[in-house]
């Protein structure tokens, strides 16, 4: 059982779902109905787990080349590729059935698109072919926002798209920081992550570009959701703290990987705090 849970990458799933509940709260202009929220979170966990399991099957030959991933269950033989594929397919179907029965048609469709996009577009088409893989492939990680919103309203508003773009622009600096830390691993696997194929200066410029757009999108989100002005001030402050980490990356060039690891951890903290802020601001408005 442990091996199958590892296939789902539950720690990654948890991060994806951090944005789902705030999206539902914003869409409902308050707390969504408990049963709907539970069904969305549970089915979303299965859907993301399905995509991750397919990813492990497809990338098992690459994973064995990387120290960070060499102990994954398909690589070690704990779970066969066939069984992992059956498991991924099964929980993916179950997630879609739950979405269809307990949420909305649009949420179900978006979930299907998210799984296919992550597995086919990102894992199979982009990841090993372009240094911009995470920029476009990362769109799959933004889908929980749209799915959560659609589960409540069966539609998508400008506010939902604003939240989508916050995550979209957050994703590259988040993953590039990780790629800096594990640069040698990605190089060994032949994965052209930007920090592997580009100069430090180029990587830093790209991280700055996406961070600035992330902050701008977060401002758009607060305004589109008509949240209190105090939440706008806090949102901007969180974004500036995020940006400060990039300054530390340049200043800490002698400990480049170590500073990048701190940026990766802060990016998770940033998204978590922003999500909590959105819920609190909506409930108090």
Where on the chain are the PLM-derived regions?
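Multi-pass membrane catalytic core of lipid/isoprenoid biosynthesis enzymes
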Residues: 68-109, 199-223
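Cytosolic, membrane-interface loops and tails of multi-pass inner-membrane proteins
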Residues: 1, 58-79, 176-203
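Membrane-embedded alpha-helical segments that form the functional core of polytopic membrane enzymes
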Residues: 18-60, 68, 92, 97, ...
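Interfacial loop-to-transmembrane junctions
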Residues: 243-273
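Hydrophobic alpha-helical transmembrane segments in multi-pass integral membrane proteins
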Residues: 146-156, 214-221, 270-285
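Transmembrane alpha-helical segments that form the membrane-embedded catalytic/substrate-channel core
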Residues: 46-54, 116-123, 165-183, 215, ...
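Intramembrane alpha-helical segments
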Residues: 81-152
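Small-residue-rich segments of transmembrane alpha-helices in multi-pass membrane proteins
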Residues: 18-21, 72-73, 136-152, 201-202, ...
